[in-house]
Design a protein with these regions (language model features):
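Short acidic/glycine-rich loop or secondary-structure boundary segments that cap or lie
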Residues: 154-155, 182-186, 238-242, 255-257
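Short beta-strand or tight-loop elements
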Residues: 54, 127, 227, 292-294
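Generic secondary-structure signature for well-ordered alpha-helical cores
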Residues: 23-27, 164-168, 209, 217-224, ...
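Predominant activation on well-ordered alpha-helical scaffold segments within soluble catalytic domains
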Residues: 19, 156-160, 212-216, 261, ...
Length: 318
């Protein structure tokens, strides 16, 4: 059976990457694509590497233009997808929202951090957080999936085994994350302008990044109690990839490197796309580029009684 797929917001970096993945999928066929800036023109007019390979004409971003689809991906900025998602689900479509509109379960939290108009706030408590390593069975049965953010994916997967074990002092988690420039999207800003980001490493939105409540929401669910994190993102001069270095104080007094390695190997034993490394083979962004892998290495520091976790993903895929 071929799944007929639509993409709303196809002109961005995420939309382009989605085309690559779907065109190489044996059971998927892209039948509709839309944007606000390229209506009436072929997708290849923006993603020029697709010239002669995929020349589907982009349609207006209206729900009825996706009537033929079984699944619709929304690759839209925050505030732009909730209304369209509501219409599509009412038409019986499965919707996967790659943006931020459906990730937070609490409407007030969404308004505090995003401040954008939300056209379907009543659905937020029921939207499934689309991290298959944690919510696989729910994802299978739901029509609305909230795709996780890029920073949160690297951090949540990096910490999940420890929080499930109760090995972490919950008030001690510090997340230092570095992202390639595509994580900022296609809209040009001073920070992403080539002369400014090339040969430059910069911190931004320290203690104020919008992914913070998403990280805290999912880590709190894993820990079974509310927690806060210190999240410190940085922009690095490369196109794609995220590396998160997460440090925390251990709650377990007799922890060893062997116990740490075993806990991660056990937790991710059946996960095809999580690869557990070790402190002698720390993961790098180049190792996961273009892939769906998350590579993780936990490290025990007996001198400071701290746990350090290195987690890497490709922000345009995983």
């Amino acid at each position: 059976m071929t799944v007929k797929v639509g993409i709303a917001g196809v002109t961005g970096y995420t939309g382009g990457e989605l085309i690559r993945l779907l065109m190489n999928h044996p059971k998927a066929k892209i039948v509709a694509a839309s944007s606000r800036s390229n209506v009436g023109n072929p997708v290849s007019a923006v993603h020029k590497q697709l010239y002669g390979y995929m020349d589907l004409i982009e349609c207006e971003m209206k729900a009825e233009n996706f009537a033929e689809c079984d699944v619709v991906f929304l690759a839209l900025p925050h505030g732009a997808s909730s209304g369209l998602a509501k219409e599509l689900v009412s038409m019986g479509k499965k919707v996967i929202d790659l943006g931020a509109d459906m990730r937070l379960r609490d409407y007030d939290t969404y308004m505090e951090w995003y401040g954008a108009e939300h056209h379907w706030p009543e659905i937020l408590p029921d939207a499934v957080y689309g991290l298959p390593e944690l919510y696989r069975e729910r994802i299978k049965s739901q029509d609305l999936i909230a795709n996780p953010g890029c920073y949160p994916t690297s951090i949540i997967l990096g910490l999940a085994p420890l929080l499930k074990k109760g090995w972490v002092k919950l008030d001690s988690i510090v997340c230092d994350s570095k992202s390639g420039v595509t994580g900022a999207g296609k809209s040009l800003t001073q920070n992403t302008h080539f002369p400014d980001c090339n040969d430059n490493l910069s911190a931004y939105k320290i203690a104020a990044h919008r992914h913070t409540p998403e990280i805290e929401q999912e880590l709190s669910a894993l820990a079974g109690e509310s927690l806060l994190v210190s999240f410190n993102p940085h922009l690095i001069p490369m196109n794609r990839g995220i590396l998160s270095t997460i440090t925390m104080q251990a709650a377990k007094t007799d922890l060893t490197q062997e116990l740490l390695d075993a806990a991660y190997q056990e937790f991710y034993a059946n996960e095809e796309f999580v690869r557990v490394r070790n402190k002698a083979d720390l993961p790098t962004t180049k190792q996961v580029q273009g892939s769906n892998y998350c590579d993780i290495a936990p490290v025990w520091d007996p001198r400071t009684k701290r746990i350090i976790v290195v987690s890497v993903i490709d922000n345009l895929v995983k």
